[in-house]
Amino acid sequence: MQAPPYWSGYNWTSIQWISAFLNTELSATDRSLTEILVENDGSLPGSSFSAPTIDSEISKHYTQIRSFLDGEDTEQIFGAAYDDAQWVVLEWIEAIKFMNEYDAYTNGSRSLDDVRKFAHRAHVFYNLVQNQFDTSTCGGGITWNPALEPYKNAITNELFMASSIAMYLYFPGDYNTDPYPTANYSSDTNTTLPSLPFMQPHDPLFLDNAIKEYDWFKSQNFTNEQGLIVDGFHVSKGQTACDERNEMVYSYNQGVILSGLRGLWEATADPSYLADGYDLIATVIDATGWNTQDASKASEWAGLGRNGIMEDYCDAAANCSQDAQIFKGIYFHHLDIFCEPLPTETPLVQGVTVLADGDMAATHSEHCESYAAWVTHNAEAAISNRDQYNVIGGWWGEKQNNKNNDDGSQSATLDMAVPLSPGSWDVVNDPSILDHEPWTCERSCRQEAVGGPSSDNGSGSDATSIPHTELQKRDGRPSHTVDTQGSGVGVLRAASDFTRRMLEKTV
């Protein structure tokens, strides 16, 4: 993503919530590199990488992570939907996790001032959502966007579980009461916010929120007949129950919940959280056709892909929005977190993490090893769809399904496009849906509801009034973008980690 040929080919930047996730990937990558240093004395089995090389990569990434703290457009994302805010929370908690692991390895300390700033950024954005769990409709859950009619969707609530448990496990505390995302926020918006409360590390509130959220999520039947998580629930006029389900299936909705389940086990030692994760992962893998024995049937749509390769509905149709272009990478990022080895010894960084007995650790390892071939298969498919700039495309399975494509380009393959299942609203890739019932906006919200514009889209001064999904079509954004490359990084890092963990067991 950082090579000059890439940037000479593309000049688009990402929308803000995706930028937060891309920065999360940098921190996660630095954690993976640190684990190599810790576990292998600085050398990766079967690789020529050395400790100085790895340290150099870590430093390069960290410089960019740190600089993005000041460059992040926090004012824009602060006013977006509730899901957007939580990507920022996870972004800076992941940076803190990296710093904790690296400092424990080096017996040193990166700037404590950085840790305080990362923690405060996470605190500011968590504060936006921590009191939004609303029992007046659906018995609980968080509404996607207050500008819309009530819609309690999977991603917002999965993120609340994941961000809450991440705050409980890794947030170091924050006594800075400044509630504003930027110094100019009050003057720019003519808004005065109440001071932030002090927040202690491992505050029970975080754990309570995570448990409460997951209990509610399970009670609402977010899964279809296949066991895949659907997008969300509307509340009909005059009703209080979630009575109209959107059957749309997206890959990222199957993923974010996994890191939350892993965190809940670390905080409670309740094995049911891991068991729920194993069940969902098995469902997703089956839904890509991976376990289909007949080759001709494996090439048929299985619910979330074919030929063992994850795919979103928009991939073959080539109508993915910027949002959707990152979805698969998000899935594999959170799968990777879920499959980190269970701790059996007191961690280097003292916290609230529970310890697994030998049988539980072995069972977890066996489950995750069984996923490795499928993860690697997806990584290989992703890198097979690079263009002349070595940028990974959005539809990882195109070459397996479109034999006429041999140049890395991606275009609509309508004979492979799959009709949406009945009752599905694909609001991510068709924001015009937001103008109609049951989505009708209470104010102008199409831009805010889907995620907001990119920070630099080359579309002129009126760009901020146009939904970014329309910007994608208007500015000619191709199928190989910073977003699709970020998605590729997600699956490649996961494949690297899964393979490394298996290699380490045999050395």
Residue map of PLM features:
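Fungal eukaryote-biased detector of long internal structured cores
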Residues: E75, Q86, L90-Q220, V235, ...
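Membrane-interfacial loop- and helix-cap regions that link adjacent transmembrane helices
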Residues: F233-G238, R245-N246, Y252, L304-G305
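CBM-like carbohydrate-recognition segments
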Residues: M1-G71, I77-D83, Q132, K152, ...
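Extracytoplasmic, non-cytosolic globular domains
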Residues: L159, S163-M167, D203-K218, F222, ...
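Extended, leucine-rich alpha-helical cores of fungal transcription factors
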Residues: Y10-W17, G79, D83, V88, ...
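Catalytic cores of eukaryotic secretory-pathway lumenal/extracellular enzymes that build
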Residues: F222-S236
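Short coil/turn linking the two alpha-helices of tandem helical-hairpin repeats
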Residues: D30, T34, I93-D103, Y168-Y175, ...
